[in-house]
Amino acid sequence: MEEIMSYQKNQFFTLLTYIVLLSLGTILSLLKITGSPYFIALTIGSIVAAGLMIYLVKLSGPNDLEEKTTLNHDLQWIIVGTVGAIALQYLIGFADQLIFHSTSSANTMSLLLMVKAYPYYFIYVMIAAPIMEEIIFRRVFFANLVKPTNIYIAAIISAFLFAFMHQDTRFLVYVAMGLWFSFIYTKSENIYVSAGSHIVMNAFVLTMAIM
């Protein structure tokens, strides 16, 4: 019982860390901090938050979906995860545009402008954000919803939460990404594999957008 309470407390503090980071932008705006100081603070905040969340993952130990894996196994699944995520993103994005006449991803374009203006912000966008999102939406939400529901319902709920958080015009693309990364997490049995795939995918999409 004490072990369960300790795990639940760990998950709570992981989620709280993420919420505090998401609130940082609002706090900085209220303090009228803008421009470079604003993005420097967000970047540093994201590094601290991601580091703390990684520490909390290590502290909690593996959950029911996780096993100790080899580097070769992890690299193979990162490649599968990245290629699948990129292909799925373009496929669903094309279908979404064709059927619903949705515009380009407002979220991607906004991040692109920020990274162009403040290059160091890529640390947040390409590295810290994917790590934190995988820990929150796959390890905290998805993994903890599997037992009270089932793996499919858990994946759908966590994917919709992931899409809702991004507040983007291409909602279906983010739902698909959420489902795909849940699949990669389940199959690889390692949260850092889905995080690695997410990092490489973000880097690829933003690099292609810049070119």
Range-by-range predicted roles:
Residues 135-156, 186-190:
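Membrane-interface helix/loop boundary segments of multi-pass membrane proteins
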Residues 10, 14, 66, 154-155, ...:
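Alpha-helical transmembrane segments and their helix-entry boundary regions
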Residues 34-36, 149, 165-170, 189:
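Transmembrane helix interruption/hinge and helix-loop junction motifs
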Residues 1-76, 80-87, 98, 203-211:
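N-terminal, membrane-interfacial amphipathic/helix-forming hydrophobic leader that caps
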